């Protein structure tokens, strides 16, 4: 199978998000923010996968841009979980770093596809 960096990274990140969700629900009894980060954090890879299998360039562009927006939303939920004390510094820094890397990759993809109109 051909390597696709964004698919690989977003899937690995989604698996970490699932573990974070389980931890937050089981250990911290937190159900609201955890559901939000589960939805957005797993949606990144789902949209990237759909984009990778798109039938048209327009569909590819749309799916990758949605993945980009979901990654930015996930970054926000990570910040809230950290600042509210639900996740420790080490967990936050590792996941935040991975999230920022995914955002940069998706920003580059969407910038190239949109002719530089993205951030």
Predicted regions and their residues:
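Short, C-terminally biased terminal segments at protein or domain edges
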Residues: 1-46, 50-119
């Amino acid at each position: 199978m051909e390597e696709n960096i964004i698919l690989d990274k977003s899937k690995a990140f989604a698996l970490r998000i699932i573990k974070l969700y389980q931890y937050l629900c089981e250990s911290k009894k937190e159900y609201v923010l955890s559901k939000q980060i589960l939805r957005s954090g797993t949606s990144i890879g789902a949209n990237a996968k759909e984009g990778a299998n798109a039938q048209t360039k327009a569909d590819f562009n749309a799916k990758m841009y949605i993945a980009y927006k979901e990654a930015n939303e996930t970054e926000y939920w990570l910040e809230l979980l950290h600042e509210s004390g639900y996740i420790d510094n080490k967990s936050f820094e590792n996941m935040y770093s991975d999230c920022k890397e995914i955002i940069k990759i998706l920003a580059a993809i969407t910038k190239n596809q949109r002719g530089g109109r993205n951030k």
